[in-house]
Curated annotation (Swiss-Prot):
Catalyzes the final step of fatty acid oxidation in which acetyl-CoA is released and the CoA ester of a fatty acid two carbons shorter is formed. InterPro entries: FadA (IPR012805), Thiolase (IPR002155), Thiolase-like (IPR016039), Thiolase-like_sf_Thiolase (IPR050215), Thiolase_acyl_enz_int_AS (IPR020615), Thiolase_AS (IPR020610), Thiolase_C (IPR020617), Thiolase_CS (IPR020613). It is found in: Cytoplasm. Pfam families: Thiolase_C, Thiolase_N. Its EC number is 2.3.1.16. GO terms for molecular function: acetyl-CoA C-acyltransferase activity. Signal peptide: none annotated. NCBIfam families: AcCoA-C-Actrans, fadA, PRK08947.1. Heterotetramer of two alpha chains (FadB) and two beta chains (FadA). GO terms for biological process: fatty acid beta-oxidation; phenylacetate catabolic process. This is 3-ketoacyl-CoA thiolase. One of its GO terms (cellular component) is cytoplasm. It comes from Pseudomonas fluorescens (strain ATCC BAA-477 / NRRL B-23932 / Pf-5). The active site is at C95, H347, C377.
Length: 391
């Protein structure tokens, strides 16, 4: 494959183990420390990359307050081997924040505004709760349905519109845990998880190199016993078919193809296209459909050209309609989220975009895929997608 000098390549990817937000492994670790540890370790294992060459650290984070406030990208960067002469910015596109961080770096590289970037994101939902400090404008109800701000109800709406049953959602939830457990047992996450010290349930310090969020004992029967989480009367979305509230961070080293060649680095993949799109906030979970269609058009590809997909599992009731309208539902078991997704691993907001993209690249490497798409829905009605080609 021939690459153009300003093509954007992914050099490496790493993430923390995913921790439960309630009493989980990261309960005594701050978001900046988690981020700095990840950046440092990823740079250590890529010795050909000079930290002084990093143009910018672009970090996704949604709730930018408390320990995640005051530009956590810069806070974390200053705690690493990256010199203070490099810059740092924190970005938020809610659930799509760290994928937007990747897009921002890619756009800079494409336009000659830097060659080497560190991108990723973090969310410590145990320390900074989802609604901490949030004050929604009551006037918004003049422009969007009140329930649009309640993600679970938007998932209920989307599932109802597309005829998604409770049984289908439960099966999807079981699949996520089973595949994530299988990937763990088979060592499929070995290259992406950067081990971190944390505390076990007894309060003992230990080195975690696995996700504590996966529940391999999950069954259809256990999920069927759960009550609806958002709509008590007739709802179908439960805690077992929703993304978990977790703590975690993810990181990528991104550079121009020319700089990678100069350094003698073999990249993981090249970005072929990117896109964002908006939808009615009432069906926010549908955003990946127009975003992916737009990205595929920009890449000159069709849906059948894509070997593997990573779709953020915000809710089973949201993921299934997306797969249905992208015409890949019948190929789900061969192409989609082969290592499970956010139902099993969790959805630390600022972390997830880079997390699913990096997991996708490892799935492509392990299974010999050429093209892959990572995509996710975004609160208040957006979607974001990236098309990768394996190098």
């Amino acid at each position: 494959m021939s690459l153009n000098p300003r093509d954007v390549v992914i050099v490496d990817f790493g993430r923390t183990p995913m921790g439960r937000s309630k009493g989980g492994m990261h309960r005594n670790t701050r978001a900046e420390d988690m981020s700095a540890h990840l950046i440092s370790k990823l740079l250590e294992r890529n010795a050909k990359v000079d930290p002084a060459e990093v143009e910018d650290v672009i970090w996704g984070c949604v709730n930018q307050t408390l320990e995640q406030g005051w530009n956590i990208a810069r806070m974390a960067s200053l705690m690493t081997q990256i010199p203070h002469t490099s810059a740092g910015q924190t970005v938020s596109r809610l659930c799509g924040s760290s994928m937007s961080a990747l897009h921002t770096a890619a756009q800079a590289i494409m336009t000659g505004n830097g060659d080497v970037f560190v991108v990723g994101g973090v969310e410590h939902m145990g320390h900074v709760s989802m609604m901490h400090g949030v004050d929604p404008n009551p006037h918004m109800s003049l422009y969007a349905a009140k329930a649009s701000g309640m993600m679970g109800l938007t998932a209920e709406m989307l599932g109802k519109m597309h005829g998604i049953t409770r049984e289908q959602q439960d099966a999807f939830g079981v699949r996520s845990h089973q595949l994530a457990h299988k990937a763990t047992v088979e060592g499929k996450f070995k290259d992406e998880i950067i081990p971190m010290q944390g505390y076990d349930e007894n309060g003992f310090l230990k080195l975690f190199d696995y996700d504590e969020t996966i529940r391999p004992e999950t069954t259809l029967e256990s999920l069927a016993a759960l009550k609806p989480a958002f709509n008590p009367k007739g709802g179908t979305v439960t805690a077992g078919t929703s993304s978990q509230i977790t703590d975690g961070a993810s990181c990528m080293i991104v550079m121009s193809a020319q700089r990678a060649q100069d350094l003698g680095i073999q990249p993981m993949a090249v970005i072929r296209s990117m896109a964002v799109a908006g939808v009615d906030p009432a069906i926010m979970g549908y955003g990946p459909v127009p975003a992916t269609q737009k990205a595929l058009k920009r890449a000159g590809l069709g849906i059948n050209d894509i070997d593997f997909f990573e779709l953020n599992e915000a809710f089973a009731a949201q993921a299934l309609p997306v797969l249905k309208d992208l015409k890949v539902l019948d190929k789900m078991n061969e192409k989609v989220n082969l290592h499970g997704g956010a139902i099993a691993l969790g959805h630390p907001f600022g972390c997830s975009g880079a997390r699913i993209s990096g997991t996708l690249l490892n799935v492509m490497k392990q299974n010999g895929g050429t093209f892959g798409v990572s995509t996710m829905c975004i609160g208040l009605g957006q979607g974001i997608s990236t098309v990768f080609e394996r190098v």
